[in-house]
Amino acid sequence: IRLSLVGSEMCIRDSGGSGLRAAIEVAEHGIDVLAVGKRPRQDAHTSLAAGGINAALGTMDEGDSWQQHAADTIKESYLLANPHTVEIVTQGAERGIRDLERWGMDFAREDDGRISQRFFGAHTFRRTAFAGDYTGLEIQRTLVAKAEQLEVPILDQVYITRLLVRDNVVFGAYGFDQSDGTRYLIHADAVILAAGGHNRIWRRTSSRRDENTGDSFRLAVEAGARLRDPELVQFHPSGIIEPENAAGTLISEAARGEGGILRNALGERFMSKYDPERMELSTRDRVALAAYTEIAEGRGTENGGVWLDVSHLPRETIMTRLPRVYQTMMELQMLDITTDPVSYTHLRAHETKAN
């Protein structure tokens, strides 16, 4: 058994969007940092995020502001969101977008060069910046390139099995390389956990089958941390049902943001019963509950879903704004979404965590 000893001022687990963003921030402050991910850095789970990233840039609607973004967030959380956390996230969101732009991210833009933004659920204004419907992939590419420019060392495919703790102080981590079995003993002055959640306790989720298994939660608890609100998992309204080996594959919210329509098996546009003002652009929880209700009351499709229809949109819109949805449905079901609707159901998506 090979053992590799590694030392760093700070160790960050994982190498997805949040992990690499933290590593970049730390490195730019002159601190020695090591990022450790259990997948190849280009293939972190962030790359599966599709529809966009939210910030009150005001590029499309001048009346938007971080305060309005915060108000929308708190209201649609049923007042469960921590106001301090919401303030930090919404106030800092524009900086996050501008950093990505400065580092070379290829955002969709208007003809005059402004970053384009579209509506997502529960937004008062258009505030979702995007790159087609593969935004997460572009974010990950940008962050990997920036981290490599800063010469941040990244250990790929290393699974951290425990944090090292002495007298209630974390001083490193232990793990192994999943490809060749090499053991890693990492000494660090501080460890940041920036990994995924525990969605795989459900059968159908937007996560990969081998990810979001809750190991970051376990690492934290075994090191003496307390978990807060682990039950607050978001149910995303749209994931495909078939084939079974791909059940849960995400159909981006961008499909509804661009004008997609939800119908039950009777052909009824059912969101008019649940949120007649916002319709398909209601909050994810309301859309998911509406779809569940339609299915439970016998108005679902034969395979237990509802229909998402974008076939009324111009083909050019679909091919430029929803290319990943188009490609996914062609590959998995040989379904042309420019002419046919998609049958889907609600699924478990992700948690929002804050340190």
Q: Which functions belong to the PLM regions below?
A:
Residues I1-G7, I12, H346, K353-N355:
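Single conserved hydrophobic/aromatic residue that forms the stacking wall/gate
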Residues H198-R204:
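Flavin (primarily FAD) binding-site architecture
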Residues H29-S47:
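Glycine-rich FAD pyrophosphate-binding loop
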Residues R13-L34:
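N-terminal Rossmann-like FAD-binding beta1-loop-alpha1 element of flavoenzymes
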Residues A56-I88:
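Glycine-rich active-site loop/strand segments that organize a redox cofactor
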Residues G16-G17, P40, Y134, L232:
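Residue-level detector of alpha-helix initiation sites
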Residues L219, A225-V342:
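An anion/pyrophosphate-binding glycine-rich loop and adjacent beta-alpha core
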Residues E101-T182, H187-A190, A194, G239-E242:
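Conserved redox-cofactor binding core of oxidoreductases
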